[in-house]
Amino acid sequence: MISRYRMEHPIGSSATPALKNGLRYFRRSLQHAGVAFRVVAFCLFALFIAQANGQGPALQPPPGAKIVNLTRHRGYFNEPSVAINPRDPRQVVVAYQTGARIVYSQDAGGRWRKASGTMPGNYAVSGDVSVAYDNLGHAFLCYIAFDKLGTDEYWGHNATRNGVFVRRSLNGGQTWQRPAVPVIEHPTQPGIPFEDKPYLVADNTHGPYAGNLYVGWTHFTLSQSVILFSRSADDGTTWSKPIRISTQAGLPRDDNGAAEGFSGVVGPDGTLYVVWADGAHVVFTSSWDGGRTFAPSRGIVPIAPPYFHISDVDRTDGFPVISIDPRGGNGAGLLYLTWSDYRNGDVDVFCSTSADRGRTWTPAVRVNSDPIHDGADQFFQWLAVDPVTGAANLVFYDRRDDAENRRAVVVLARSTDHGHTFDNYLWMGEPFDSNNDFIGDYTGIAAYGGRVYGVWTEERPRSSRHQAGSPLHHTVVRLGIADFADAGSSH
């Protein structure tokens, strides 16, 4: 190990003063030391070297760590979403694109099967999937479907027919009802808008609007982007006429400046809390009447633009995600908010909390535990607060161990002290390079009773020679499981 260290980290003019002084002390200490002292001294010095070079201790896997390959082959697979049935936590459902593909488990992730009846009909493409369980244990799938996109990044320019759709499963995700129910749909005609990035929220609380379903999304036109919203009070059978909930309009381009990235959560009293990004802020609003009306939206956290360039990734964003600990906040719940931006020079993941229904928010806490300003990017975070334990869980890609800032692993971060600090765990330790492929716009995570499920996209290695008939895209969807229920309070 000493010779390996010398090869990779020579002590010379580039070494820090602390490293040089430590080496001198280490050599002097060993001259008259016994064997036991030498072993202890070497271990301590190895830790000192790692810290002196800006590296913390190696991350450990979370308790009960398990990785599952959900796609058996490579393809254009990305943007996964995961949900746990609160009526029966053994039931877990995962959706991913392209197409609205579903896999499900009836035994807490022990075995996974493909669902039937989920692929959309009558449209060429579908995606931007999300899943949720309602208070009855019914599973719901939301997605967009269209024939082709509009002008590059300007989806409302020359868009073809498109819409937002929802499907329901009455047996935990095994089979899905047809046809899909349109939340909003546009037939083919000149000048139609484009509906993008919907996200589904279910009220599975015991509040006055229990059972309600909510969908928010970005509505692109030729001149602007706004956040639209619709609700269902009859188990997803019908949906209300969409209303605009963004006070300020965004730019018409699917990029910085757009009103985009809807995320929502329901508090224990039935209040719906919603966030998105507008290019300069995390924007927040809420509804106290089951989604009929909303307060004026307002910026709550200034952020660097949510779209940013990361090497070897087709595109990257830091859209906000909101979740809630129903046991906190003086009965109203403790809200958690996460996003990522590059305020520190490289991309980091941040978290803030609110104990007063979103009126005020705590200063941003950096979630990733690598040294600040180390040049490593952490991105595509997603958040889930365990409704049973109150622990906040985040999943994200992490490049802290790659000096070139290209290869990523997957990290699970967890807070048990109301978001003040986060423990980082190495969930997937096989680094991958995205190779400029599209790995989606988001990951996913769900937690219940100490058991955590995370889903993400990975680029798989390509062969040196492209063979005819081989897939043009090389991504897979994987799932990680962690179990803190039997790990003790120290975790």
Task: Describe the role of every protein-language-model region.
Residues Q55-H491:
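Extracellular, repeat-based ectodomains that mediate carbohydrate processing or recognition
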Residues R6, A15, V39, C43-L44, ...:
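N-terminal regions of proteins, emphasizing targeting and processing segments when present
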Residues M1-V35:
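N-terminal secretory signal peptides that target proteins for export/translocation
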Residues S29, A36-F48:
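Bacterial N-terminal signal peptides
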Residues S13-S14, L44, R72, S434:
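Generic alpha-helical structural signal
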Residues F48-G56:
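Bacterial Sec-dependent signal peptides at the C-terminal "C-region" and cleavage site
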